[in-house]
Amino acid sequence: MRIVFAGTPEFAAEHLKALLDSPYEIVAVYTQPDRPAGRGQKLMPSAVKALAVAHDIPVFQPPTLRNEDAQAELAALKPDLMVVVAYGLILPQVVLDIPRLGCINSHASLLPRWRGAAPIQRAVEAGDAESGVTVMRMEAGLDTGPMLLKVVTPISADDTGGSLHDRLAAMGPAAVVQAIAGLADGSLQGEVQDDALATYAHKLNKDEARIDWSRPAVELERLIRAFNPWPVCHSTLDGESVKVLAAKLSTGEGAPGEILSASKDGLVVACGDQALSLTRLQLPGGKALAFTDLFNSRREKFATGKVLGQ
């Protein structure tokens, strides 16, 4: 079977690795154009491109698949199937129709819940009990196609966006390989999604990461976990930015953002309902530290009565 793979970040690269170890022929890889990255803003290849180059697989990086030249280039590859994982470009219907068996997608949620750009973080933020990977046939709509296969994992009370991402990135590749086998032998037909159950995982916005201390502590604790490692929740103290990488629910009352206590166990801050104990912070110019270490060296900065977010 001739497969074209389309993907961009590390999550997609894990899927490409599994396909390279499978009996299927990867005839080409599509990925987004190189982007500036790092302090020097040098053009850097995507994780998928780096892996493809290392395996001598032809790489295509069109800025769009909406023009006829890009579509003709894909058609010339004569693919049987296109596997799309976190590619980042919209595939018009003419592209979806090029492969003999169509296009399939590995999506990091239990569809139809959390269609869209940020399903992993939104699942943690919402307090979902479980997440997973859905392999589906692609349609012109956003993550609306018939579902071929699902794998499920519970979301634990200490899962972050990063830890759930890594777990799903490890689960998804085997599901894709299994789905391809099912398509090849005709055993997988696909289950139509119930649009009435659909929710949308909107793209992450850095402004969302600014902590609003008037919100309930339970919501903020989930948000802090969901946005770790990016975009990372933050607030201000004494006019300086403070990144909050970990917190746990606590008790106490005060004005939203008010420091209620500080000890080696954490910095307890009042919220709109209950309080949070901040256990891992990062100050400007420093690295992320357990609050125990900050408390020992910067005790005066975290005096009771000070207010975060002002």
Swiss-Prot record:
What InterPro entries does the record point to? Fmt, Formyl_trans_C, Formyl_trans_C_sf, Formyl_transf_N, Formyl_transf_N_sf, Formyl_transferase-like_C_sf, GART_AS, Met-tRNA-FMT_C
Which residue pairs form cystines in this protein? none
Q: What GO terms are given for molecular function?
A: methionyl-tRNA formyltransferase activity
Record-linked CDD domains: FMT_core_Met-tRNA-FMT_N, Met_tRNA_FMT_C
> Which keywords annotate this record?
Protein biosynthesis, Transferase
Pfam families membership: Formyl_trans_C, Formyl_trans_N
Q: Which reaction does it catalyse?
A: L-methionyl-tRNA(fMet) + (6R)-10-formyltetrahydrofolate = N-formyl-L-methionyl-tRNA(fMet) + (6S)-5,6,7,8-tetrahydrofolate + H(+)
- For the protein in the UniProt heading, the enzyme class is transferase
Sites binding (6S)-5,6,7,8-tetrahydrofolate sit at S109, L110, L111, P112
Supply the EC number(s).
Answer: 2.1.2.9
**A GO-annotated cellular component:** cytosol
Return the SUPFAM superfamilies for the record. Answer: FMT C-terminal domain-like, Formyltransferase
Q: Which HAMAP family match?
A: Formyl_trans
What this protein is reported to do is described as: Attaches a formyl group to the free amino group of methionyl-tRNA(fMet). The formyl group appears to play a dual role in the initiator identity of N-formylmethionyl-tRNA by promoting its recognition by IF2 and preventing the misappropriation of this tRNA by the elongation apparatus.
User: What family does the database annotate?
Assistant: Belongs to the Fmt family.
Q: What is this protein called?
A: Methionyl-tRNA formyltransferase
The protein's organism comes out as Pseudomonas putida (strain W619)
Q: Which gene encodes it?
A: fmt
